[in-house]
Design a protein with these regions (language model features):
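Alpha/beta-hydrolase superfamily serine-hydrolase fold, recognizing
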Residues: 2-240
Length: 240
């Protein structure tokens, strides 16, 4: 149905290491977020790598904001959320929007964000056995090169942990588990935002795997996490 200009919107950038999934494939995650927050969710069906590099992919997400602006929405009406690679994409897109002089979304929610595709971070080594599927040499590395040339892996639009957050960034909730190869990514992104004086919350759950919030919705940890998402959305979007 057509969106009313009074609606509050969640734009969702899905995970899949930039090379897998689609908006249709992740519909259950989008429905979960919508049901738990009461927001209308737009899942971005961005072009996958290698058919699209980061320059085009970030522009595709930004085009959704531009289209909503034509329909009367402002950035204050929108929360941007993403999981895994989609979490890194959401943060990278936000930095790019800021640098382009665009209004940034009211808030971000990042689930297990792949925020540094350059294999920098302690837990790429220390937690590699916790999630053996996500090995850098076999899965993440080839996906990273499909999405961005090696020289661009530390570009803030690609790996937002390298962003200059002193220039501004929306309130950001980062959630993940202790059994994730990307745990160092979460911590470094949080530290960068916190040290720059931005509003940020790091919410980590003992023993939880990658993107547990929507994939283990019946768990006590997921229920606790989504309650904090509701509070975050209420504080930074719905109370405006």
């Amino acid at each position: 149905s057509e969106l009313a200009s009074t609606d509050k919107i969640a734009i969702y950038t899905h995970g899949g290491a930039y090379v897998l999934n689609s908006a249709k494939a992740v519909i259950e995650s989008a429905m979960f977020f919508a049901a738990e927050t009461g927001l209308r969710v737009i899942a971005v069906d961005y072009t996958l790598a290698p058919h699209s590099k980061w320059q085009e992919t970030t522009d595709e997400v930004i085009s959704v904001f531009k289209e909503l602006a034509k329909q009367g929405f402002t950035a204050d009406d929108i929360v941007l959320y993403g999981d895994s690679a989609g979490g890194g994409l959401a943060a990278g897109v936000t930095i790019k929007m800021r640098d382009l002089g665009m209004e940034m979304p009211a808030a971000l929610v990042l689930w297990s964000p792949w925020a540094d595709i350059s294999e920098t971070g302690d837990t790429y080594v220390t937690l590699r056995d916790a999630e053996p599927y996500y090995t850098y040499e076999h899965v993440l590395g080839p996906s990273a090169l499909a999405y961005a040339d090696a020289k661009d892996h530390k570009n803030p639009y690609v790996s937002p942990v390298y962003g200059d957050f002193k220039q501004g960034f929306p309130p950001t909730l980062i959630q993940g588990g202790t059994k994730e190869i990307f745990l160092s990514n979460f911590i470094r992104l949080y530290q960068g935002l916190d040290q720059a004086g931005q509003t940020v919350k790091l919410d980590i759950y003992e023993g939880m795997p990658h993107v547990f919030v929507p994939t283990l919705p019946e768990s006590a940890e997921s229920q606790a996490a989504i309650a904090k998402v509701r509070d975050w959305v209420s504080e930074h979007l719905l109370d405006d």
